[in-house]
Every structure is written in structure tokens, then in C-alpha cells.
Amino acid sequence: MKLHELTPSEGSRFSRRRIGRGDSSGQGKTSGRGQKGQKARGKVRVGFEGGQMPLYRRIPKRGFTNINRKEYAVVNLDGLNRFDDGAEVTPESLKEAGLVKKSSAVKVLGNGKLNKKLTVKASKFSATAVAAIEAAGGKTEVI
């Protein structure tokens, strides 16, 4: 077998349908849209259900968006193990390490085990995270 002898497997390639190019093309006259009616004419907008009350209006409105909500990037204790012993961990260093996407507000949670003595600076800490960091000989600082 040579490169010029390679052919695509049967049924894997289709030529595009040239719609509305004469009756003998098989896609002429009504172009696969059937006879008359709404669907044979222009477009029907997304979500339109033919006059029936659409789903997005049948479902009740719920809740609201709290404008004072603060989003925190979450970091767990096992993620802090990648820093050197005695290092100072800040939101900027967490971003450089790839643990958070933005160096904004960070909350440290207590999942996993911390094996190193670190000084951790973050916006918030869970009680278990503070206990684990201090048990490892480190310090926590709310910024």
C-alpha cells in the first residue's frame, strides 16, 4: 500500500447538499422544507414553541443576585505542600504556583495534611485550616 492508494472508508465522507438547485438535484423546489407553513418560510426564533407558553416563562422566577457577594478562590492544605519549608505563602505566590487563577481573595480550607512550616497570608481561613497550619509550626495572617 502506498500513500496515493489510500482512500477514505466507505460512508465516512459526504458531499455537501446543494439546496434549491433544480428538481433533478433531489433538493430543488421546496428544498427539503415540505409544503407551506411557518417552517417552510422564515426562521423561528430560539425558544419559540409555536404559540404555546414557552418553558422559560412557565418556570417561576426564584431568588436574586446579592450585589455584596464576595467570591473566594479556594485552596486546600495539601496544595500548600508544594511550597518550600519556611516560605511565605501569599495570594500572588499561589497564582504563580497555579493553585488559583486570580490573585484576589483567597480562602484556605482544611482538606488534606500540611507537612511544612509555612506563613500563610489569605483573606479567610477555616478553623480546621488554622489549627493544621499552627500544628505544623506555621503562622496564619488575615489580609
From Swiss-Prot:
Any one cellular-component term (Gene Ontology) = cytosolic large ribosomal subunit
Query: Which keywords annotate this record?
Result: Ribonucleoprotein, Ribosomal protein, RNA-binding, rRNA-binding
Q: Please note every region of biased composition (Gly residues).
A: 23-35
InterPro entries named in the record: Ribosomal_uL15 (IPR030878), Ribosomal_uL15/eL18 (IPR021131), Ribosomal_uL15/eL18_sf (IPR036227), Ribosomal_uL15_bac-type (IPR005749), Ribosomal_uL15_CS (IPR001196)
Query: Per its UniProt record, what Gene3D superfamilies does this chain match?
Result: 3.100.10.10
Q: Which SUPFAM superfamilies match?
A: Ribosomal proteins L15p and L18e
Query: Region Disordered: what ranges?
Result: 1-47
- Check the record and name the Pfam families matching this protein: Ribosomal_L27A (PF00828)
Sequence intervals crossing the membrane: none
* GO biological process per UniProt: translation
On whether RNA-binding is a keyword of this UniProt record, the answer is yes
Please name the GO terms that the record assigns under molecular function. rRNA binding; structural constituent of ribosome
> Which superkingdom, per the lineage?
Bacteria
Q: What does this protein do?
A: Binds to the 23S rRNA.
Quaternary structure?
A: Part of the 50S ribosomal subunit.
Family according to the record: Belongs to the universal ribosomal protein uL15 family.
- Name the record gives this protein: Large ribosomal subunit protein uL15
Q: Which organism is it from?
A: Lactiplantibacillus plantarum (strain ATCC BAA-793 / NCIMB 8826 / WCFS1)
